[in-house]
Design a protein with these regions (language model features):
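ASCE P-loop NTPase helicase motor core
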Residues: 2-161
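C-terminal accessory regions
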Residues: 252-382
């Protein structure tokens, strides 16, 4: 919400006018969802880094087969870029190519090795910080201020609290009750909200536990309701694997509808304003759906991990914060969570846990990118 999309459009416009259009630029992102979001925001076709480099599954980025022959490469969501991915990009661009990385170094680190964005900033690579927040609602004063100031804060007492950024105080034992009551009411009302959790399993407010409970509260099983495995007609689901046949990406959230009787049951996924349909019984019998295409891989999405939410936006987010999961509460995780919200953040738990998260900085990754680059600058072997 800081004007990044406008900046991308301006950069591309400048290059369009200065070089031949066929070799002007490539827009890319680390994931399919991020690439599609970039395309939708700018109206300019974007690709995954994997696709731009011609990387095949399970291969190393340095073994990519495609050269990028443009004068400009713009990579969005650069906090997700691993050291190997960056090496693949730099290994396959022309010597006179400009590489522009856009991202937030305060968000979660990449899944792969390295801390690329922060390391490049330490090396003094030319950079611009967009500090003004525009995405948050004008009425969400505290949320807007907290998102902008969070990287510089160290104590929950420095946060601004109002109706747009609030804490529902609760003991760990009743966090699931309070959170699910609030979330279920909002889901049933059709609000654009998302429950986020720092943990996937093992606690009462893990993604697994919250999904089971919220499914029962928001979409209870009845004698008339159709099911498919753990899914029920009307469930909120997330796509967990890119599927080119259905043009959906890992991270897409939609609603699953199940209709018909055996052997003619049909599943329809409503996602991003389109409908994706397949024959359930064909999948169960043959392992494939329409035209032998694999069906979408799905999971319940009433609750998601903060990692899964990266790159997405919601009007409101609800998140449990408890000392019971203190080992998983990090500064960049909490920051990533609150920056997913455009209007409202509701934390359910206690201030001690919020404070712990704000003061807990992940152990630094030893990628040696900074040290080796500095040695090369001095003319020494890295």
């Amino acid at each position: 919400g800081s004007g990044k999309t406008t900046l991308i459009e301006a950069i591309v416009h400048c290059f369009r006018g200065s070089v031949d259009s066929s070799e002007a630029y490539v827009l890319a992102a680390p994931t399919g969802k991020a690439a599609r979001n970039l395309t939708e925001r700018t109206g300019i076709e974007a690709r995954t880094v994997h696709g731009a480099l011609g990387k095949v599954p399970d291969a190393n980025f340095l073994d990519a087969v495609c050269w990028i022959r443009t004068r400009l490469v713009v990579v969005d969501e650069a906090s997700m870029v691993s050291l190997e991915m960056l090496a693949g990009i730099l290994n396959r661009v022309r010597r006179n190519c400009r590489v522009v990385l856009l991202g937030d170094p305060n968000q979660l680190l990449s899944v792969g090795a390295g801390n690329v964005l922060s390391d490049l900033l330490k090396l003094g690579v030319p950079s611009i910080f967009l500090e003004q927040q525009y995405r948050q609602s004008a009425a969400a004063a505290a949320l807007r201020q907290n998102v902008a100031a969070f990287p510089k804060l160290s104590d929950e007492r420095e946060l601004q609290w109002d109706d747009s950024f609030r804490l529902l105080s609760a003991d760990s034992k009743i966090i699931p009750d309070l959170l699910c009551e609030e979330a279920a009411r909002r889901y049933r009302a059709g609000e654009s909200i998302q429950v986020l959790s720092p943990v996937r399993v093992k606690t009462g407010f893990s993604v697994q536990a919250l999904n089971t409970r919220l499914q029962n509260e928001v979409n209870p099983l009845t004698a008339e309701k159709q099911t498919w495995g753990a899914f029920r007609d009307g469930d909120r689901v997330i796509v967990t694997q890119n599927n080119s046949y259905y043009n959906i990406c890992n991270g897409d959230v939609g609603v699953l509808y199940i209709r018909g009787e055996k052997p003619h049951r049909v599943a329809t996924l409503a996602v991003r304003g389109t409908l994706k349909t397949w024959q359930i019984d064909c999948v169960e019998k043959y392992g494939a759906a329409n035209d032998d295409a694999p069906p979408p891989q799905l999971a319940l999405a009433y609750a998601l991990t903060v990692h899964k939410s990266q790159g997405s936006q919601y009007d409101a987010i609800l998140m449990p914060v408890s000392m019971a999961t203190a080992k998983m509460l990090y500064r960049n995780l909490l920051y990533t969570a609150i920056s997913r919200a455009g209007r409202e953040v509701i934390l359910v738990g206690n201030r001690e846990a919020v404070n712990t998260a704000m003061q807990c900085i992940p152990y630094p990754r030893k990628s040696k990118l900074v040290a080796r680059t500095n040695l090369l600058r001095l003319g020494r072997s890295a």
